UniProtKB/Swiss-Prot annotation:
Primary localisation category: nucleus
Any GO molecular function: transcription coregulator activity
Subcellular location: Nucleus
Transcription is among the record's keywords: yes
Membrane-spanning intervals of the chain: none
Composition-biased stretches (Basic residues): 316-326
Keywords: Activator, Nucleus, Transcription, Transcription regulation
Disordered as annotated region, ranges: 1-84, 217-326
Gene encoding the protein: ROX3
Residue ranges with Polar residues bias: 41-56
Protein name, as recorded: Mediator of RNA polymerase II transcription subunit 19
Function of the molecule: Component of the Mediator complex, a coactivator involved in the regulated transcription of nearly all RNA polymerase II-dependent genes. Mediator functions as a bridge to convey information from gene-specific regulatory proteins to the basal RNA polymerase II transcription machinery. Mediator is recruited to promoters by direct interactions with regulatory proteins and serves as a scaffold for the assembly of a functional preinitiation complex with RNA polymerase II and the general transcription factors.
One Gene Ontology CC term in the entry: mediator complex
Biased composition (Low complexity): 1-35
Length: 326
């Protein structure tokens, strides 16, 4: 028995939908055996329909339950997507899933010029494009031309613009090389020319002779030894002596047996033979540098003759007349 009063004025809290729900729940509980622990009232079926109805009514009036309109049937397809864990396919590639995480954060500037833009208008080539177009802007067909020589001459383009017609199947052309059999190609262009083979025996025998430097067949009158830095024995000494003029009656320095000058006093005996030696005393302006200037012949003395060397006039100097007073 229910403790709640059942008066005629009080409408019944049972509804057809609620009674059917309770009957289905009671039948399913009593007919189904489960291994999970269940409360005692659910096993013996001692649940009271009025209590179930009260719980259902209290659940409907719960403030935490979401409210929606009566005509809002909801989206079953959307609920199904969220409830079922299905795999995404190619159709879901463009599905909006919100902001991507760590994807495309680096900005990529648009390249210039872009292919979608009008390049003729951008670079001022619209007039030239209209002149060489096959169809004019008004729809008329432009006169066909074989070449663009007239436009090239008018623009003043440098170079030779006439094509040079050649036989495409000529020897060593691209088509000729492509048509060569494999064995012929290996024989002509591969065998004996591989870099891994190195030098042949014949080349190695001639290599030492080819790398040796010599005079060769240059004529003697055109050969210049100074280019190679070669100086024969005594040549450099003679050139140095002939290049410097000497004072009158100045003795020449004596040379050794090999053409080298005699070492001076106070200099080391062992010197480099390939190094040229100074043959003339270095000019100086000390007290000893004027030695010998006053020891020359006096023009006023009665010498009788003169060699004439160092004199600006040519020929021998005349003897001076000596007056004898009686």
């Amino acid at each position: 028995m229910s403790c709640h009063p059942q008066t005629p004025q009080s409408p019944s809290q049972f509804s057809p939908n609620t009674s059917d729900l309770m009957m289905s729940m009671t039948g399913s509980v009593t007919s189904t055996t489960t291994t999970l622990p269940t409360p005692a009232h659910s096993v013996n079926g001692s649940s009271i329909p009025s209590e179930l109805t009260q719980d259902t009514a209290m659940g409907d009036d719960s403030p935490h339950k979401r409210k929606r309109d009566g005509d809002d049937m909801g989206s079953r397809a959307q609920k199904k997507v969220h409830v079922e864990d299905r795999k995404l396919g190619i159709d879901d590639l463009h599905m909006d899933v919100g902001e991507k995480y760590l994807l495309c954060r680096t900005p990529h500037p648009r390249p210039r010029p872009h292919v979608s833009e009008d390049l003729f208008e951008m670079y001022g080539l619209t007039g030239l494009a209209i002149e060489v177009a096959r169809v004019r802007p008004n729809g008329e067909k432009n006169a066909l031309r074989k070449t663009y020589k007239g436009h090239i001459k008018r623009l003043g383009v440098q170079g030779h613009f006439d094509e040079d017609k050649q036989d495409p199947n000529r020897e060593y052309s691209l088509s000729h090389l492509m048509k060569l059999p494999q064995d012929v190609w290996d024989l002509q262009h591969v065998r004996g020319q591989d870099i891994r083979d190195g030098f042949t025996n014949e080349v190695q025998q001639k290599l030492s002779r080819a790398m040796t430097m010599g005079r060769g067949v240059v004529p003697r009158d055109q050969w210049d030894s100074s280019v190679l830095g070669e100086m024969g024995p005594g040549k450099g000494e003679r050139q140095a002596l002939s290049a410097r003029p000497t004072a009158p009656n100045t003795p020449l320095p004596s040379a050794g047996p090999q053409g080298l000058p005699r070492p001076k006093t106070g200099t080391p005996l062992m010197q480099d033979a390939s190094r040229s030696m100074r043959t003339i005393k270095k000019r100086s302006y000390g007290d000893s540098s004027f030695e010998g200037y006053g020891e020359s012949y006096d023009d006023g003395a009665d010498t009788g003759y003169s060699t004439g060397e160092g004199d600006m006039s040519s020929g021998q100097k005349r003897r001076k007349k000596v007056l004898i007073n009686d």
